[in-house]
């Protein structure tokens, strides 16, 4: 088990993640980088609203204050 959120986030860079926003919208993609404010950059991003895929993006940038949680996904 990871000892801190930062340790977990650094461990999942380059891996597929699920990001849930406070609005309830989900993004799935490859976490490419993040900063100290938890702003996130994703590659090969899919957007899900109410469980349905609504958009596909090459790259997406998500502002950290909108993030409810980040979860690692199986490859």
From Swiss-Prot:
Q: Localized where?
A: Cytoplasm; Nucleus, Nucleolus
Task: Show the CDD domains listed in the entry.
Answer: LSm6
Q: Which UniProt keywords are given for this protein, alphabetically ordered?
A: Cytoplasm, mRNA processing, mRNA splicing, Nucleus, Ribonucleoprotein, RNA-binding, rRNA processing, Spliceosome, tRNA processing
Entries under Pfam families matching the protein: LSM
Q: Name one GO cellular component term.
A: telomerase holoenzyme complex
Q: Name one GO biological process term.
A: mRNA splicing, via spliceosome
Q: Which residues cross the membrane?
A: none
Give the InterPro entries listed for this entry: Lsm6/sSmF, LSM_dom_sf, Sm, Sm_dom_euk/arc
The residue ranges of the Sm domain are 4-75
Question: One GO molecular-function annotation for this sequence?
Answer: RNA binding
Where is this protein primarily located? cytoplasm
Question: PROSITE patterns this protein is in?
Answer: SM (PS52002)
Annotated family: Belongs to the snRNP Sm proteins family. SmF/LSm6 subfamily.
Q: Oligomeric state and partners?
A: Component of the heptameric LSM1-LSM7 complex that forms a seven-membered ring structure with a donut shape. The LSm subunits are arranged in the order lsm1, lsm2, lsm3, lsm6, lsm5, lsm7 and lsm4. Component of the heptameric LSM2-LSM8 complex that forms a seven-membered ring structure with a donut shape. The LSm subunits are arranged in the order lsm8, lsm2, lsm3, lsm6, lsm5, lsm7 and lsm4.
**What does the record give as the function of this protein?**
Component of LSm protein complexes, which are involved in RNA processing and may function in a chaperone-like manner. Component of the cytoplasmic LSM1-LSM7 complex which is involved in mRNA degradation by activating the decapping step. The LSM1-LSM7 complex loads onto the 3'-end of single stranded RNA. Component of the nuclear LSM2-LSM8 complex, which is involved in spliceosome assembly. The LSM2-LSM8 complex plays a role in the biogenesis of the spliceosomal U4/U6-U5 tri-snRNP complex by accelerating prp24-mediated annealing of U4/U6 di-snRNA.
Protein's recorded name:
LSM complex subunit lsm6
